[in-house]
Amino acid sequence: MTGELKGKIMNKIVKRILISAGAILGAIILVVGCYVIYVVASYSRIEDNLALTPEGSGSVEIATGEEYTVVTQNLGFGAYTADFTFFMDGGKESRARSADSVKACVKAGAEKVKSFDPDFAFFQEVDTGSTRSFKIDEREIVKEYFGGVSSSFAVNYHSAYLFYPILEPHGASNSGMLTFSKATIASATRRSLPISTGFSKFLDLDRCYSVSRVPVVGGKELVLVNVHLSAYGGSDEIRAAQMNMVLGEIQSEYDKGNYCVVGGDFNHDFTGDSTQKLNGGEEVDFGWAMPFPAEMMESYPAAVRAVDYSDGLKPTCRNCDVPYKEGNFTIIVDGFLTSKNVEVAGFEYSDHNPVVMKFRLA
């Protein structure tokens, strides 16, 4: 074989390799491009001031001077067993282990909250048809534990299919917040929180809080606000805007003469120093665990943060980059804010992350 012939053969081989590589690259670009178009085209925010339809009726009358119990619990879409790690926290997993695991986790959370016999209960990350939780309607599971009461449900976010991680995509998410009341909820509203308008909005998803109104003897209202603030994709400006809106809600209701209790997952270091006190004084920065902006409350004199714990500090959350074991990073992110005409009579954390508060209306 002559050198010229060898050269021609090599040129053909190289040409075919380049054509094949170009075709593969082109196909990848096309698929990625189509996916980006799908995500962008399917993105939409749920409208603000959306009226919700309360279900059921309660048998309790709310009056001043009486003691009531409220509990808040983030169900973590039914995935967070002790050894679960989450990819957005630096862990490995993007979905719950199994449908049975989801059901067991949700039932355990609902049972724990019910054990406090609360007059009011707030749940966050209640999935109703998400890939990550095997399309299980967690709302219906929780409702089985709270019969004979009034409830409202607000969709927090509904996302397009997230094709990441590649080997086990997180998928589509449909998740919301569920509020229970032994007194009848007269009306309820979904309020849209400020979120990023840039690309990070596709990571942060939609965000909201729900407002459930319960009549009080004498004509006023007890306003129950169930909240789940941003963790991923939120800038300092977005975090501040969300907190301003929540604090403004408290101030507005107080100015009307109403009573306001805000409970849920604030995705902040709720005490401002729990990351140090719960972790041996160590400064730990996971980005989303920013200190609660206590200085903002000066602009909302009616708002009070319930941090006078009767049983000491106990964590409500862990960073899910590694399976849990004693000594791992923990933090307090869940809690309650109230209007100052609500007297906090007792406050504690349970061993399984719900936050419990006893209060009276002044």
Model-derived features: where do they sit?
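Surface-exposed cleft-lining segments at the edges of enzyme active sites
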Residues: 92-99, 126-128, 193-201, 228-237
